[in-house]
Amino acid sequence: LNAIEDWGTYHFLDIGEAALGVGIAYDWLYDEWTKDEKKAIEESVLKKCFATSKKVFAGKDSWMKGDFNWNQVCHGGLSVAALAIYNTYPEEAKFIIERAAECVPYAAKVYEPDGAYPEGASYWEYGTTFQVLLIEAMRSAFGHCYGLNEYEGFMESADFRIQLNGNIGLEYGYSDYHRGYYNEPVMMWYAKELGRSDLQQNELEKIERLLDNPTKISRLSFFDLLWWSPIKTDGSNVKGNLRCWQANGKMPIAFMRTDRYHNHAYVGFKGGTPYHSHGHQDSGSFIYESQGVRWALDLGTESYDKMRKAQLDLWNYEQNSSRWTAFRTSAEAHNLARIDSDP
């Protein structure tokens, strides 16, 4: 990675990811690096991560203070790298860490008040995982995390995620949903933090499914091992079997089910607005499953590459944006009550 001159100036998400990997490798393998290797890694972080990040504008639509997953990923990755080289470059590292502590709350506020995440299941896992990595890195270094785990709805978000799972093994795939990995290590962290055996059991069941399809394993699966811990509970805080659950906020959502078994009924429906990162014209839509069949579904994301090839304005969420001419993002692709063809 050091040999690559540019880690992603024009797609800063790549720099956030690279910074995380380099920071972990530098810190965890510190005694294995030679003096020259350490210096090369430090210089790459300073030049290709920190210096580049200082050129990012902080205005509208920027990830710097954005309310979407890029904020968590970029600040999280950069801060892990900063903590790794803190002893050598304390001033440079301090700037990155304090900036993250100031900016990440803009993303953390989208969980208010009950934990629902506007960007959907896929980007919940992505953004939330990086915020948790930032929290854990800060705790390890400083003994605190600037209160980044205390924002309203952030810890409750574990229930939101578990309620997205239907009874037949499918998720409620609203917004730009990518059906991805079976396991989500961040749920093991929530289980540990909340003392929730139901969350832990849910993640363990997902890991067991990997025996049948190992290609669906999360690239961060080693955190399942690091965040697992024995949980003793009397069951009083177990919520995974709730038959009704709802969340207010930027994207209100609700779920009901007759039970959690395969043949039982499950319905999920959402409100909110398409005018948000990865949004679809799906406000008021629903999904429904019963007798082991999902009768009403959400198709999830359209291929970004196909949308770019069609020259659609992929990240424009205005009413008349060409983004909505793609079928999967449009009202036509969702289960909506409509009047005169308008949602």
Task: Set out the residue ranges of the language-model regions.
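Short, charged N-terminal helix-start/capping segments
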Residues: 37-70, 189, 196-219, 291, ...
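Glycine-centered flexibility sites
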Residues: 76-77, 115, 252, 292, ...
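General N-terminal targeting signals
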Residues: 46, 50, 109-112, 134, ...
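Aromatic-lined, polymer-binding surfaces characteristic
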Residues: 1-170, 177-178
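Sparse, context-dependent recognition of short Cys/His-centered cofactor- or disulfide-binding micro-motifs
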Residues: 14, 18, 63-66, 70, ...
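Replace the tail clause
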Residues: 32, 36, 245, 326
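Catalytic core of carbohydrate-active enzymes
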Residues: 266-343
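Carbohydrate-active enzyme catalytic cores, enriched for enzymes
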Residues: 85, 123-295
